[in-house]
């Protein structure tokens, strides 16, 4: 994973990093020069390739032992969402849900101008990585991906 790190101050200074955009009254505004240190992501960034490597290492037990992987991915807390599919359960660091009978284990996050989601489909071996560089654009891509991979 050579393209993953933290850009806590100015993401625009990370070589090759996409600029982040936010919707404002005058259209899209490049906000890549805004510090990320106080945001929920902590300035973390990655690429689809690096996140795929992470998921493959986790599933292939090269990141953790099989027992530890099971511990990390076993649901711990139920959290049904009224009125929608939502998150069924949480594991250690991942959301665990059933979509059309297919198990999906994933994690998402974002900060102004950037959003991302990593979903692992254990029963099929599929991994879906969605990264965007514009606020509020990730959900349609995730819904299309889920529909393709779960038949929903």
Predicted regions and their residues:
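Catalytic loop of the DD-peptidase/beta-lactamase superfamily, centered on the K-T-G motif
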Residues: 11, 23-25, 29-152
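Active-site helix/loop module of the DD-peptidase/beta-lactamase fold
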Residues: 1-20
